[in-house]
């Protein structure tokens, strides 16, 4: 069920009216949000529901066990690691297994080694990268004692499957989103009008900007051999606006839809094409993903605290992972490597090496603010 579909146009007002008819009962609202979100998600494929339910139950249980063994650090470490491995294994099997299997088969064939070509050919569940990272952030934050684990399983289900941001982000943190499901929410005309403005602005970006740019982009690159260099250059410019309108448009619709239900989501894009350099660009582009990689990968690896060589290594790692996160394809890996190279050059060109290592952190802010 896409945001710009007739089905969603019917779905949203019905869910909105029924949700606010329960305004005196927070638990009932949460249960209804879960039911509506599962209907929304199951619209693509009912099989997806089993997978997201498994992720949710295991992540909820990990929080409960982490609280139960609060004074036993080794046990807590095992629980946290087990949940991370489980969630990443599910993500790997569905999204990355065939990519790495194809790569291994091609590599062995290059050296004349005959090997079976094993592929799973599994349907990729919509939004699995988003809700997996959201589930991981909960477990890690509870393990780090940045968050008290919840015993309210319905609220936790709502946190993982909240339909406005389920399939296209923003990737929310439990520290921001989960507490909003644990307290009463009041309807106000101000938040409803804010939500509608964001939805309309997002639809404009998606349907007017992105979709119209896509017509020119598709026709240009479909016949790239027969068009001149100037046209190809304009095709690249239009493609930049297409992906921005597409991605940020969906984020705006998600943020606006959440506001209709009294929920505030983080800002995901902040005029990225007005950035002065690559570091600032990555402060403004897909903020929720970039802050996730900083908090859970970059900083644990040492961040920029141990000199330029360590910083360069960590920047390369998070950008390669970011490329893989966007898609199981060599194109995305190269895209990640290209952006890593640009930021590494920026670090090396910094005149004051004492502060050069701050560039990477600036490019991927820790704050979840917009």
PLM features: residue spans?
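Membrane-embedded transmembrane alpha-helical bundles that form the catalytic cores
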Residues: 1-370
């Amino acid at each position: 069920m896409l945001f710009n579909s007739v089905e969603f146009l019917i779905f949203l007002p019905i869910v909105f009216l029924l949700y606010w008819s329960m305004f005196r009962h927070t638990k009932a609202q949460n249960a209804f949000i879960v039911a509506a979100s599962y209907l929304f998600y199951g619209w693509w494929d009912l099989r997806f529901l089993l997978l997201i339910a498994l992720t949710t139950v295991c992540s909820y249980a990990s929080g409960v066990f982490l609280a139960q063994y609060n004074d036993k650090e080794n046990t807590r470490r095992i629980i946290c690691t087990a949940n991370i491995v489980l969630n990443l294994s599910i993500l790997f099997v569905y999204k990355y297994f065939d990519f790495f299997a194809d790569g291994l088969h091609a590599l062995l064939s290059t050296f004349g080694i005959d090997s079976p070509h094993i592929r799973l050919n599994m349907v990729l569940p919509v939004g699995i990268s988003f809700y997996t990272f959201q589930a991981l952030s909960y477990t890690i934050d509870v393990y780090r004692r940045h968050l008290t684990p919840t015993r309210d399983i319905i609220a936790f289900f709502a946190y993982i499957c909240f339909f406005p941001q389920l399939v296209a982000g923003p990737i929310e943190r439990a520290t921001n989103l989960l507490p909003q499901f644990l307290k009463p929410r009041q309807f106000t005309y101000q938040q409803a009008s804010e939500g509608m403005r964001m939805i309309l602005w997002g639809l404009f970006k998606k349907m007017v900007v992105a979709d119209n740019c896509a017509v020119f982009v598709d026709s240009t690159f479909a016949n790239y051999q027969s068009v001149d260099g100037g046209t190809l250059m304009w095709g690249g410019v239009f493609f930049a606006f297409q992906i921005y309108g597409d991605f940020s448009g969906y984020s705006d619709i998600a943020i606006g839809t959440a506001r209709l239900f009294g929920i505030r989501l983080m800002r995901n894009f902040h005029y990225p094409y007005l950035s002065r350099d690559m570091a600032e660009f990555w402060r403004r582009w897909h903020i929720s993903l970039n802050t996730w990689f900083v908090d859970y990968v970059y900083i644990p690896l040492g961040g920029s605290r141990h000199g330029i060589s360590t910083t360069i290594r960590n920047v390369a790692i998070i950008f390669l992972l970011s490329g893989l996160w966007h898609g199981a394809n060599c194109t995305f890996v190269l895209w990640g490597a290209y952006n890593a190279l640009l930021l590494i050059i920026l670090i090396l060109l910094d005149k004051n090496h004492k502060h050069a290592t701050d560039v990477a952190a600036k490019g991927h802010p820790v704050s979840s603010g917009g």
